[in-house]
């Protein structure tokens, strides 16, 4: 079974978007895990920097997790990169590969994760925006998570 961690290294998922995302993940037969700080923890970001880092590290270090999927981009993940790289040696000890999914500010984590931590990185919609994704792209994304061959053809 694929285990997906819902993370918020940048902005938070507001309202009921975290629960909707968790329900969507589970509706596909995957196991969803929330690594989100309490909503409203910070006036701008999902939480203060130290708290966002702690939640992200918990997700990375959880041996069950296959995929880290950001609930939202926006800003703030760049601030976490130096702290992740300080822990590079311990983070590289994962027994199975880790995939990071998301876009926007999450791109900073994509670059660091791919170049320094050996993560597989896929530039995808965030979980908050997944429901505004066109059906063809969403179907390809589901196939990608299911490890099926993905081929995109222009209409």
Report residues per predicted region:
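ATP/NTP phosphate-donor binding region
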Residues: 1-64
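Short glycine-/acidic-enriched loop or helix-start segments at secondary-structure transitions
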Residues: 16, 77-81, 110-112, 133
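Hydrophobic structural segments
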Residues: 59, 80, 112-114, 120
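Short, acidic/small-residue loops that bind anionic groups at enzyme active sites
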Residues: 87-112, 120-127
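Structural motif
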Residues: 4-5, 66-67, 99, 119-122
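Conserved anion/nucleotide-ligand pocket segment
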Residues: 118-155
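Fold-independent oxyanion-binding glycine-rich loops
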Residues: 9-10, 37, 71-73, 103-106, ...
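N-terminal glycine-rich "phosphate-gripper" loop used for MgATP/nucleotide binding
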Residues: 67-83, 103
């Amino acid at each position: 079974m694929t285990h997906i961690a819902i993370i918020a290294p940048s902005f938070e998922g507001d309202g009921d978007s975290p629960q909707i995302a968790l329900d969507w993940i589970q509706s596909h037969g995957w196991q969803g895990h929330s690594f989100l700080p309490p909503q409203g923890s910070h006036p701008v970001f999902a939480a203060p920097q130290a708290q966002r880092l702690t939640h992200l590290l918990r997700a990375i270090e959880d041996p069950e997790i296959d995929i880290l999927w950001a609930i939202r981009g926006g800003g703030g993940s760049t601030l976490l990169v130096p702290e992740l790289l300080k822990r590079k040696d311990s983070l590289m000890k994962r027994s199975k590969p880790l995939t990071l999914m998301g876009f926007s500010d999450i791109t900073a984590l994509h670059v660091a994760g791919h170049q320094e931590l050996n993560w597989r990185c896929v530039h995808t919609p965030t979980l908050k925006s997944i429901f505004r994704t066109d059906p063809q792209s969403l179907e390809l994304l589901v196939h990608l998570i299911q490890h099926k061959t993905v081929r995109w053809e222009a209409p």
